[in-house]
Every structure is written in structure tokens, then in C-alpha cells.
């Protein structure tokens, strides 16, 4: 019985970590207002719910971007797609060495509210996170 309960809790936590697509009408007004205030020249292409947070995907200055908001409209982080060649030295080599047969498909620069910069390298089935110096942090399965 304990095992079943633990499996159910794990399944619930896992389901909360995956993004769920949302209709704009399902996004809190505070979040939509915050988006319009911070990115007045952009139009949301897609809304997603990530756990208790809300992600807006949009294009700005010819680059794919996203911003993650809390339910009150506070920015948690921003993500800007970059060229793979813009990743810090060593990230592409790290992928080749540690994920045999894989290559980086997409790359992004992520900045949190404290100004901390991380890089995301997307490979098949997961995203790999690196610090601003290119040091591996963790992998996130898609």
C-alpha cells in the first residue's frame, strides 16, 4: 500500500512538471497585464502552464523568446533562443562526449530575476542546463 501511495505521489509531481497548453482566456489577468507591460511590442504565440506558473512564448526582434510568470504576474525568468555557435566554449563538446550520438538541436540563454545567466542546450528527449561559464548543471527530460 505504501508503494502504491508513493507511486501516485510521484506521478502527480511528474504531471505538474510538464507544460500544459492553455487558451488565453485561462491565463490570469495579472499575468496577461504583466506580459503587455513588459513586452508591449510583442504578441503571445502560445501560453503554457508549468506547475503553478505561466509561460508566454513570443517572437521579438526576430528571435523566439519566452517568459515565465508566477500567478501574480511576477517574472521568474526569460529565455531567448540563440544560435548554437553562441553557446559558451565546451558545451557542444560536453554533449558529444557525454551523450554519444547526440547533437545540440537548439540553444537558448535563460536569465532569472537575479540576473543569473544559464544556457540551455536541447538534445533529443531532454534539455541540458549549463552555467554562464559552460559548466554542466543538470538535465531535464522532455
Predicted regions and their residues:
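Short, low-complexity, Pro/Ser/Thr/Gly-rich segments in the mature regions of secreted, periplasmic
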Residues: 127, 131-142
